[in-house]
Every structure is written in structure tokens, then in C-alpha cells.
């Protein structure tokens, strides 16, 4: 399968803004692979389309910055000063290289055309090179690809190396294309993808006609996308919908997914990042659980042992992000994990089991229920304990008054509110479901991503003063919903200056456009209808609550979330 043929389709995908047209072009790619290539080619093309070489769950990166890429390109005859000027003009290194490559003698005519396999395997080798002289070796490999590439191939090769394809292709659109082409319900593919986090593997198995492959099943040490809750306007409304339900304390912590096989333990964040090394005390506590193979979910909370109440969320992030002096940090910040679900135990998957059964299995493993109705005194006594592994506090009821008492108690011990869970519901990975709700005392804050930064004035003249913030639609397209500048300390502004300067796409004078990589949580006075923004809404008086380093752009709030909160807000007026 020729890389050139794939790039021609990528170009068509890039030119259209219509999701269905993007899907249909990708269907043509699938058809091309079926005719000219092999299933493994489709696997690689799926990764490439979303700017990856490795599967989504795999944390490895190529680690090639723009500087090394520029050096690789200048070694094949493109002048550095011309390239830098063209990058400034286009705002896109891929387009810049394409335009300049078209002006030099086409040496690529004397070489065999690049194949998908060659491009993919070469970049994999680049990502695996380490040690002394690694930069020179990487430079040679990358240069060899650009030497043989045509101008359009150079555009997508450069973007792939920087892991940003800019064609507007995402996993949901690929899943849609696979569903249409192979005539398989999209919901089925979405579930498999959420379990594997490997769109390439899924596509390959579909082309092989092997959708029941063991490789597509739940697997230890391959984290799965978490099931997410929706917001409910009231406890009464949730009970009206569910009937008898399980209420659990909603913790202000960081969600973790824990995998255990004997003495091997891995801990993953909600973004599926491996945070094992930062949490050694949790690893040791999990090793002592008397189960051989296990996948459980929980909330990791920083605990103040003097009061038994949770410490600020930022303390948890300090632990998660720590790479050095971990022992010292362990003494400063004590952690506790409240387990709340089980997905796998000793060769048996529990994903399709009802929540009531999953909870019972989890309680058998821990050895107690933490039932607020019958064990409240013991629970309160143990708030200040050294316990590292616990199980979420629960109340099973259909009585709104009793549920409200449990909710108020959860707030009184320093937590956020309650989760409300349908006892009969299976675990639906990767979905925001209507079988699990969260209820908090105030309007839900929003997780948004920064897309522009405006240069500051006065006291903020050395930093950026305000930031354009965006939510997303279901396809991953970003929509501005306001600008925020309050709630930030000088240290925050200094941090943002450093981070934003690394991800500038285009300098627009008074402001800069940046890659959507910095996620922040914002509070606001209210959500308003607005013609100013294409999404139709604007935040009134937004303020930064905290940085969400545990979340990526795919996990920010959606326009649908904004609409739902807006309706809840109207109901409260």
C-alpha cells in the first residue's frame, strides 16, 4: 500500500469540514486497503489518521520536536531560513515543507515510492532509539523518508512525526466508517474500542473477519476507558427514574484504574496514563489484596490525618506528577483509594454483570460493605486511620429523605456530593450513561481547554492576561464559550506563560493561537444564551478553579453538557 495513495485521501479529508464526507473518504481508504493492501496496513493507517504511531493506550511517543524535524528537512536541500519564514507564513510546518519541497529538484523520482509499511516501521524505529548518538540516528532515519517523499507526502509525514495530522479525523468518525463498511452496529464497535483503546487493532480484526478475537477482550495491563456519570438536577428526579438505587459518597479525588496479576501492579489515571511509580504505597497495599488477578476502579483522595477530611485536589496532582523524591512526598501527602467498581477477577470479566453483583464481589474482596445505614459509627471512627485501600461509602434506598441525609453527611465530612447508581446496570466503558448520576450542591463546573492566549497589560504585562476557552462537540470539534482571566495567581500565570510558549501554533499579534493541550476547570455565575459564539452559549463571569492535568482535550465538557446545565439552571431560577 503506497503512502502517496493514503496522503491523497488525507488531503481530501482535510479539505472538507463535513463529518459525513470525512467518513466516506475514510471508507474509500478501507476499500483501497482491501484491494491493494493487507489488514495490517489498515491498522497502521488508523493510527496515522489520528496522528499516532502507537495505540492510544500506549504512552510511548516519537519524541521528535520541531527543531529536530527542521534539521532533518534542511539536510535534504531545503534552506533553514526559507523554511522558518514559510512556517511563520503558513502556521503549519507540514504545509511549509510541502511548498518548499515542490520547488527543489525532485530527487524522489529516482527512488522507489514510499509504502505505508516503510513509513510506519521507520517511525517506530525512531521512537525506540535511545542512548548515546540517538539524535543523529533519528535524524538519519527521518531524513531518509523526506528524501524519498513527494511534496504532499512530506506534508503528512511532517505532521505525523509531530503527532498532529490536522485533517479533522478522530476515533468516532473512524468507528462510524468501520460500522458502515463492515455493517456492524456502531454501539458494538464503540464498546470494543473502549475496552481495547486500540482503533488500529479493531480495524485490522474487522478486515480479517475476526471480531470475536481474544485480542479484543478485556486484558490485564491494557486500561479501558472509564464509564462516566451524568449530572442530575435533584435526588428526587434520579430516584424517580431509577427507583431503588445505590448512593455513594462522591469524592474530590483522582479516578484510578488498578490492574493486578500476582505481585505485578499497575495504576492508571482516568486519561489511562501509567502513574504506578508515583504511588508506591498504593501498589504495596494492592499486592496484599488476596486475589491473584484483578481490575478495579476507585477514587484516589489526599487525606488530612488530623481531621480525616480530604486535602485540596491539587495535592493529589502533585503526587501523580511527581517523578523524584517520591518518598518525601509520601510523608507530606497521605493517599487513600476508595474502590467503587470491579471489572475483572481471576479470569472472569464483570463488565456485563449488574452493578449490584459487581459491588457484592468488591465487598467480598475488601471484607466489609461500608454501609452508611448500619456501619456509620465505624466509618466515622476510621476517617483518621492509616487505611490506604477502602471501599466507597454507600446507602441503598428509594427514600429521598434518607438519601438527602446521606448526601448532607457526605458534605459534612468534606466530600463533593453523591453518586447515584442503577443497581441493575452493566458497566459501559467509555460512555456517559443514564444509569449513573452525580449530584453536587452547586452548578457543575466545566472542564475546558485553552485555545488562545491574549498578551497581558499593566501588572500582567510579562504574562498572558486572558485565555479563550472551548468546549467540544461529540465529534471532538472545539467551540469557544468565553474568555477567562480571573482565579489565577502569579505562579499560575508564570506557569501558563512557560507552557503556552511551547505550544503556540500562530502569533496573531495581541494574542496567540495554541494547541489545545491545557485543560482547566472553570466555575461561573451562570450560563447564558449567546449569539457571540457558534455554540450558542457563553459563560458569565468565569473564573479558573484549578488545572486539570489529569484530563485531555477529549475529556473536556461538551456542548450537550452545557445545554443540560443551562436547563438545570433555568429550573432553579
UniProtKB/Swiss-Prot annotation:
Keywords: ATP-binding, Cell cycle, Cell division, DNA damage, DNA recombination, DNA repair, DNA replication, Ligase, Magnesium, Metal-binding, Nucleotide-binding. It catalyses: ATP + (deoxyribonucleotide)n-3'-hydroxyl + 5'-phospho-(deoxyribonucleotide)m = (deoxyribonucleotide)n+m + AMP + diphosphate. Its cofactor is Mg(2+). CDD domains: Adenylation_DNA_ligase_Arch_LigB, OBF_DNA_ligase_Arch_LigB. It comes from the Archaea. SUPFAM superfamilies: ATP-dependent DNA ligase DNA-binding domain, DNA ligase/mRNA capping enzyme, catalytic domain, Nucleic acid-binding proteins. Signal peptide: none annotated. Its EC number is 6.5.1.1. InterPro entries: ATP-dep_DNA_ligase, DNA_ligae_ATP-dep_bac/arc, DNA_ligase_ATP-dep, DNA_ligase_ATP-dep_C, DNA_ligase_ATP-dep_cent, DNA_ligase_ATP-dep_CS, DNA_ligase_ATP-dep_N, DNA_ligase_N_sf. It holds the Pfam family DNA_ligase_A_M. One of its GO terms (biological process) is cell division. One of its GO terms (molecular function) is ATP binding. The active site is at residue 250. ATP binds at residues 248, 255, 270, 299, 340, 432, 438. The keyword Electron transport does not apply. DNA ligase that seals nicks in double-stranded DNA during DNA replication, DNA recombination and DNA repair. Belongs to the ATP-dependent DNA ligase family. This is DNA ligase.
Amino acid at each position: 500500500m503506497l503512502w502517496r495513495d493514503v496522503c491523497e485521501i488525507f488531503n481530501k479529508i482535510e479539505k472538507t469540514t463535513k463529518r459525513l464526507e470525512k467518513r466516506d473518504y475514510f471508507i474509500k481508504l478501507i476499500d483501497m486497503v482491501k484491494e491493494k493492501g493487507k489488514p495490517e496496513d489498515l491498522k497502521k493507517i488508523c493510527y496515522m489518521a489520528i496522528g499516532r504511531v502507537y495505540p492510544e493506550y500506549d504512552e510511548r511517543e516519537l519524541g521528535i520536536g520541531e527543531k529536530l524535524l527542521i534539521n532533518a528537512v534542511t539536510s535534504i536541500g531545503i534552506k533553514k531560513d526559507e523554511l522558518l519564514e514559510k512556517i511563520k507564513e503558513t502556521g503549519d510546518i507540514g504545509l511549509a515543507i510541502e511548498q518548499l519541497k515542490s520547488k527543489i529538484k525532485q530527487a524522489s523520482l529516482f527512488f522507489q515510492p514510499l509504502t505505508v509499511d516503510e513509513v510506519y516501521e521507520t517511525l517506530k524505529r525512531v521512537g525506540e532509539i535511545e542512548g548515546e548518538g540517538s539524535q543523529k540516528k533519528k535524524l538519519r532515519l527521518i531524513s531518509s523518508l523526506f528524501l524519498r517523499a513527494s511534496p504532499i507526502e512530506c506534508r503528512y509525514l511532517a505532521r505525523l512525526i509531530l503527532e498532529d495530522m490536522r485533517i479533522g479525523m478522530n476515533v468516532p468518525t473512524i468507528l462510524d466508517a468501520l460500522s458502515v463498511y463492515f455493517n456492524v452496529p456502531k454501539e458494538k464497535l464503540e464498546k470494543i474500542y473502549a475496552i481495547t483503546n486500540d482503533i488500529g487493532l479493531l480495524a485490522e480484526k474487522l478486515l480479517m473477519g475476526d471480531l470475536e478475537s481474544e485480542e479484543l477482550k478485556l486484558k490485564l495491563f491494557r486500561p479501558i476507558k472509564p464509564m462516566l456519570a451524568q449530572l442530575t438536577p435533584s435526588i428526587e428526579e434520579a430516584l424517580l427514574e431509577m427507583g431503588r438505587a445505590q448512593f455513594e459518597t462522591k469524592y474530590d479525588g483522582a479516578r484510578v484504574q488498578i490492574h493486578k496479576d500476582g505481585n505485578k501492579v499497575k495504576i492508571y489515571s482516568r486519561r489511562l496514563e501509567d502513574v504506578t511509580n508515583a504511588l508506591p504505597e498504593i501498589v504495596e497495599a494492592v499486592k496484599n489484596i488476596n486475589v491473584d488477578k484483578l481490575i478495579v476502579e476507585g477514587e484516589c483522595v489526599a487525606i488530612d490525618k488530623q481531621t480525616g477530611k480530604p486535602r485540596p485536589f491539587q495535592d493529589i496532582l502533585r503526587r501523580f506528577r511527581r517523578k523524584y523524591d517520591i518518598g518525601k512526598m509520601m510523608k507530606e501527602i497521605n493517599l487513600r483509594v476508595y474502590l467503587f467498581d470491579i471489572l475483572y477477577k481471576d479470569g472472569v470479566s464483570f463488565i456485563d454483570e449488574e452493578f449490584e453483583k459487581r459491588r457484592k464481589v468488591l465487598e467480598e474482596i475488601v471484607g466489609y460493605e461500608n454501609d452508611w445505614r448500619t456501619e456509620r459509627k465505624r466509618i466515622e471512627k476510621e476517617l483518621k486511620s492509616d487505611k490506604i485501600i477502602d471501599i466507597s461509602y454507600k446507602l441503598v434506598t428509594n427514600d429521598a429523605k434518607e438519601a438527602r441525609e446521606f448526601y448532607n453527611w457526605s458534605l459534612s465530612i468534606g466530600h463533593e456530593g453523591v453518586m447515584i447508581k442503577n443497581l441493575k446496570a452493566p458497566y459501559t466503558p467509555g460512555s456517559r450513561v443514564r444509569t449513573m448520576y452525580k449530584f453536587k450542591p452547586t452548578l457543575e463546573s466545566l472542564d475546558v481547554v485553552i485555545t488562545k492566549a491574549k498578551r497581558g497589560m499593566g501588572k500582567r504585562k510579562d504574562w498572558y492576561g486572558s485565555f479563550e476557552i472551548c468546549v467540544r462537540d461529540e465529534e471532538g470539534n472545539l467551540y469557544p464559550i468565553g474568555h477567562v482571566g480571573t482565579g489565577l495567581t502569579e505562579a499560575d500565570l508564570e506557569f501558563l506563560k512557560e507552557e503556552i510558549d511551547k505550544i503556540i501554533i500562530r502569533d496573531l499579534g495581541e494574542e496567540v493561537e495554541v494547541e489545545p493541550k491545557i485543560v482547566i476547570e472553570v466555575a461561573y455565575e451562570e450560563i447564558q444564551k449567546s449569539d457571540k459564539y457558534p455554540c450558542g452559549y457563553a459563560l458569565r463571569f468565569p473564573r479558573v478553579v484549578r488545572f486539570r492535568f489529569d484530563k485531555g482535550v477529549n475529556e473536556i465538557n461538551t456542548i450537550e453538557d452545557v445545554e443540560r446545565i443551562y436547563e438545570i439552571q433555568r429550573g432553579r431560577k
